[in-house]
Amino acid sequence: MLCLGALTSPAHAATAVTYFVSPSGSDSNPGTSADAPFRTLTKAQTAVRSIDKSTSGPITVMLAGGVYRLSKTLTFSSADSGGGTAGTVWWKAAAGQTPVVSGGVQVTGWSRTSADSSIWSAPAPSGLDTRQLYVNGVRAQRATGSLPVSVTQTATGYTTASGDPMAGWRNRSAIEFVYRGGLGLWTEPRCPVASVTGTAITMAQPCWNNSTRRVMRTDDSGRTYNLVGRKSITEAPTAVENAYELLDKPGEFYLDKTEHRFYYIPRSGQDLTTADVEAPSLDTLVATSGKASDEPSHIGFQGIQFSYANYTTSNTGTGFSEIQATYQVTGSTGYATQGLCTFVSGGTCPYGNWTKMPGALRFTYDSSIHFDHDYFVHLGAAGLDLGNGSQNDTVTACVFTDISGNGLDLGGVDIPQPGSAAQHTSGITVKDSHFYDTATEYHGGVAVDAGYIETSTIAHNQIDHVPYTAISIGWGGWPDKVRLPAQPNYSNNNTISYNLIHDHMSLLGDGGAVYTNGITGTSMSNGEKVVGNVVHDQLNTSGGHVLYTDNGATYVSILGNAVWNINVSPWGSKHVNYTAGDGTYDPTDIEGNYWPNGPSDYDNKKVLIKDNHAITGSAQVPSSIIAAGGIESQYRAILSWQPA
């Protein structure tokens, strides 16, 4: 029988319902007890949909530990919603257990390629394409090395002065060139090779054009500026990836898609005859219907690990022509038109609408979706995406790590001025969560990225050991480079407060702990608030600031933060407010911060800087500020969490 519990008064009792699921269960079971669980999440979803939520009591789907392998995306719609007497429908881990929702396939049958070789191989599922491999939960590195020959750039790629050794490599069209800093200090674009013939290297399209032919803009004084980043990659690649001939270090792998085999050199202590080797196969683990008319609401996920999602667009001719924060230029005319709106003839609108890297979990047009003590790990693109139309969602005490791109995406950049309130991303709370080792592959990614959002809070999180910016918020401010107004948008009343951020900016430049771009409100009262954050050990020396107000950042208040042990300025910088058009700066309020080498007091042209404190280290910061930064005490156990 169903797991029942009486609620409210006996005359109007609402029955609590619990369904049980286990990887060792059966979908022919009733699923109403831990002794007779369902086997699949889709069967549990069907059962939940059959309940009348208007009269039901609380509904729980209880997941036993183990791996739930998905062959297709688990999609939620209005039929899955809670509400009414049912409240929130919770999908949750059984006590003391960690269920893993996986988009991966196991790779078995490993053997040495020869008796004296360090390389092992195993068959890959036919048709599988992936950029990742995980051995006992440890991410392997695609075979990588340096470019083996000097090159000269051409319109279609490169030429070499003498014969190119890559011409003799197998599967040359699978080779990928990596350009750290190639389209700006904050970027790391990647383009595949199309062919290598003699001394000619032809690069794949449209990635090559999108990375070498970007439109420049001339302002009214005749000065030519880039809109975002550089016009073109001009240097030779800083690394070459994905060739069997580069497979030479423990922990590296290569997937030969022609012969359908993986090759791998084990790390010390790894035994491939017994190891759990996982290859991502499914791009999206969980998603919503994406329709405002079919909005899921009042659904929660608790104690679940989401892992082994795939992403292979970068393997195609599209490559990865990065703009910023893993947004990229795509399409055959992307370099000339995408997101450029009124800036160029034929430019597509709105301004700044570049292509977003998808999340392993993708939510749009939803409300009151809750993530509590969930774990986002071993993912091939972004982690969790709460996009357009996500409203009143919460992320509490979650862990984001070993993610190829951004950890958490909020909002988007494609609808700056929505036609309806349903399109707003609003009321999001991200708190007491741990982000570390994100952007492990696409190093220009950020731990938490927010585009256009409103009335949202990012508070009491810890972000550490990331290659670029920790938190990025806002978009569309770059037109001020050519003396034009920033993109109007609906962002307002967002707060970034009491976060602990350290050991960030380890690989790229021109970023910060908290980076803001574009208009954040309509006044100082409802503009962005950056309050009480504790930041130390920002690692870069090339450009950027710690609390960074970049192009068009308007109505930002930076109050009571603490910063130490840095190699760049703690705040920057003033920008002319071309939206106002009156010669003032973008309105900014900077007060009561503790930091080294901060700006002098200033009160002019709508920028106020006062009562800040020059320090040389943490000992000069009030203990109350340090104590308030980061994860609150009741949630700190997540700092010792380990993947299942």
Question: Which residues does each PLM region occupy?
Answer:
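Extracellular beta-strand solenoid repeats
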Residues: 62, 69, 75, 90-92, ...
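The right-handed parallel beta-helix/beta-solenoid scaffold, focusing on the short coil/turn
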Residues: 17, 57-59, 66, 72, ...
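Extracellular polysaccharide-degrading/modifying enzymes targeting complex plant/algal/animal polysaccharides
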Residues: 20-365, 370, 416-420
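Short glycine/acidic-rich loop motifs that flank beta-strands on beta-rich extracellular proteins
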Residues: 72-73, 283, 310-316, 358, ...
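Extracellular beta-rich repeat passengers
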Residues: 141, 145-147, 308-312, 539-643
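Secretory targeting and sorting signals
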Residues: 1-14
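Right-handed parallel beta-helix
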Residues: 297-308, 347-349, 367-381, 390-405, ...
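Active-site-proximal loop/turn and secondary-structure-junction residues that shape catalytic pockets
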Residues: 390, 414, 454, 475-477, ...
